[in-house]
Amino acid sequence: MERIKELRNLMSQSRTRGILTRTTVDHMAIIKKYTSGRQEKNPALRMKWMMAMKYPITADKRITETIPERNEQGQTLWSRTSDAGSDRVMVSPLAVTWWNRNGPTASTIHYPKVYRTYFEKVERLKHGTFGPVHFRNQVKIRRRVDINPGHADLSSKEAQDVIMEVVFPNEVGARILTSESQLMITKEKKEELQECKISPLMVAYMLERELVRKTRFLPVAGGTSSVYIEVLHLTQGACWEQLYTPGGEVRNDDVDQSLIIAARSIVRRATVSADPLASLLEMCHSTQIGGVRMVDILKQNPTEEQAVDICKAAMGLRISSSFSFGGFTFKRTSGSSTKREEEVLTGNLQTLKIRVHEGYEEFTMVGKKATAILRKATRRLVQLIVSGRDEQSIAEAIIVAMVFSQEDCVIKAVRGDLNFVNRANQRLNPMHQLLRHFQKDAKILFQNWGIESIDNVMGMIGILPDLTPSTEKSMRGIRISKMGVDEYSSTERVVVSIDRFLRVRDQQGNVLLSPEEVSETQGTEKLTITYSSSMMWEVNGPESVLVNTYQWIIRNWETVKIQWSQDPTMLYNKMEFEPFQSLVPKAARGQYSGFVRTLFQQMRDVLGTFDTVQIIKLLPFAAAPPKQSRMQFSSLTVNVRGSGMRILIRGNSPVFNYNKSTKRLTVLGKDAGALNEDPDEGTAGVESAVLRGFLILGREDRRYGPALSINQLSSLAKGEKANVLIGQGDVVLVMKRKRDSSILTDSQTATKRIRMAIN
């Protein structure tokens, strides 16, 4: 108290007040506050104060050799007095202006390469078109979106290795570049950035933008591909939207789109094969999208779509723990349930065995055009809050939720028999039977559901069985909301298992995905999809099957030829001949097969009747289960171009045409490849030339294993014996000579010996 009184006394004298309020601050605590640490405490003030000085900048001494002391107007650019406390020069802001106008220029060649993503964005915006602005309520839902157009799909670890290798090649540290894309990008970037003067850190940062997918969980109403997300702030507000068409596409969006199309085609095709899982894996491994192996894309691409996730599960990759039903992604947000089997009777008195989930659970449902929150108990829908773009989308969500609830009134609303089948002609499981039934017609379902009066709740309205909105009444437990339901944000992935029929289950045994969930929507892929698997030949129609089958035989002729003579049954069962069967008229398949197999047997038995071209031509017909009959054919029919076309047993036709002079085969006018051996040449020529260095011992001896082709002989050791298939379908036993000197005489001897061995 005393001190305060004293201070008050002092302040009452005007001179003291002047001293205390006007003199400089030299209190230690304050000085400490503003001078301790490197962090500037008042940057704005510091800047003003510095710039008011004549020489606020310091620079390296070398600057005096590059910049004149005075500019054209005679103003001083740098001071001759050194900066206190360092050996740097004090420089005027005018020096910066001089440098910008007259200083040295660097090459700009690397800028578009390093800042590629920015340059491309400008181009997209320049060529994009902005349409009118519409004012309306925006139903936005948060989705995980790609915010970085034009990137490759490397993991952050892979990208880190590439960046280190490109930007800091001499730094110590192990870098393992294994994937094809890593090696390709590294090579390309090293070439592009030779002599680059842009700061390495900046180059590294920009490379990261180019190599890694960046995702954010953002509210979106409309397009979710990265070229729309980059202009999100321009195209949608709280109550308005602006139509926009991007001025260009980027590869990452194209990869996502093409991957979905390829995965759907593959799952659909695998479903109808004898072993769906094995077929699916074979197709994934032999397919390329835009020149990149599909399995590599699947490992890196985070796209979540039913077919894509089935392919990932088959490859042993982790996928999202949400499950799919009726085209909606369900994520349980609370509650739990146990499963038990229960038999129920439909309105048509058909018995269905369904797996009932007992217990109270809450789910979010997210679809392409509608989202919902579902609360359910055992076989009872408690509440469903739906939001969607239009009446149709809302109806779809309601049907799926009603079926999912397994309420008795759903099962009783079934009229007629449930006998929906999948592509492989197998009956669908009961839940999908119900779903398909009501997706066709849900009138009775909605009418039987029941109606209730509703309270007036902000942002919610009712919906009647005819799908009209109402503020007084609604279908029991169902409301329409203006607000969307956010997609599940977590990027967590779980270990799953997949069975032979492509049903994907989590570790608790819940089915997350099945082929029934794969959309039938067909799009046109943005990138070229190359299906090398024979199972996908039919994707492009009958002509493609025909051409591909013959191309395959010609490409693999060496091994086909051996199997034809040694193990024909195994050859006939090859899956590469499966697609061809769909081209042969059903009634004729067995007869054609029996006829061709008999013909082939005669060729094997009767000397000198081996005919390469004829074997290639007729081989696919022998793959069907044969019927024994005495029928002879001069031509065989295949269904292409909308009608039956004939393949002649002897001679050429528009379907199958072999040109002797060029040794090339054309199928329906398309080139199917060249035969490397001359089908008409006698035994002596090619074989004896190739058999130099081998001694022919006589006819085939099975103890020495299956027949090799001539090309495989080189792997024999000296003195080793082997059976070998020579041009006309005959097999002889040979031994590799122990000495090289006698090779010259071999060709004459070989010719004689072959004749002797055969005869």
From Swiss-Prot:
Biological process, per Gene Ontology: 7-methylguanosine mRNA capping; cap snatching; DNA-templated transcription; symbiont-mediated suppression of host cytoplasmic pattern recognition receptor signaling pathway via inhibition of MAVS activity; symbiont-mediated suppression of host gene expression; symbiont-mediated suppression of host mRNA transcription via inhibition of RNA polymerase II activity; viral RNA genome replication
Subunit organization: Influenza RNA polymerase is composed of three subunits: PB1, PB2 and PA. Interacts (via N-terminus) with PB1 (via C-terminus). Interacts with nucleoprotein NP (via N-terminus). Interacts (via N-terminus) with host MAVS (via N-terminus); this interaction inhibits host innate immune response.
Motif Nuclear localization signal, chain ranges: 736-739
GO CC terms of this entry: host cell mitochondrion; host cell nucleus; virion component
Marked site (Mammalian adaptation) residue numbers: 627
InterPro entries documented for this protein: Flu_PB2_2nd, Flu_PB2_6th, Flu_PB2_C, Flu_PB2_CAP-bd, Flu_PB2_middle, Flu_PB2_N, INV_PB2, PB2_helical
Any matching Pfam family: Flu_PB2_5th
HAMAP family listed in its UniProt record: INV_PB2
Subcellular location: Virion; Host nucleus; Host mitochondrion
Molecular function (Gene Ontology), one example: RNA binding
Protein's job: Plays an essential role in transcription initiation and cap-stealing mechanism, in which cellular capped pre-mRNAs are used to generate primers for viral transcription. Recognizes and binds the 7-methylguanosine-containing cap of the target pre-RNA which is subsequently cleaved after 10-13 nucleotides by the viral protein PA. Plays a role in the initiation of the viral genome replication and modulates the activity of the ribonucleoprotein (RNP) complex.
Family according to the record: Belongs to the influenza viruses PB2 family.
Organism this protein belongs to: Influenza A virus (strain A/Swine/Tennessee/24/1977 H1N1)
Recorded superkingdom: Viruses
Alphabetic keyword roster: Cap snatching, Eukaryotic host gene expression shutoff by virus, Eukaryotic host transcription shutoff by virus, Host gene expression shutoff by virus, Host mitochondrion, Host nucleus, Host-virus interaction, Inhibition of host innate immune response by virus, Inhibition of host MAVS by virus, Inhibition of host RLR pathway by virus, Inhibition of host RNA polymerase II by virus, mRNA capping, mRNA processing, Viral immunoevasion, Viral transcription, Virion
Name of the protein in its database record: Polymerase basic protein 2
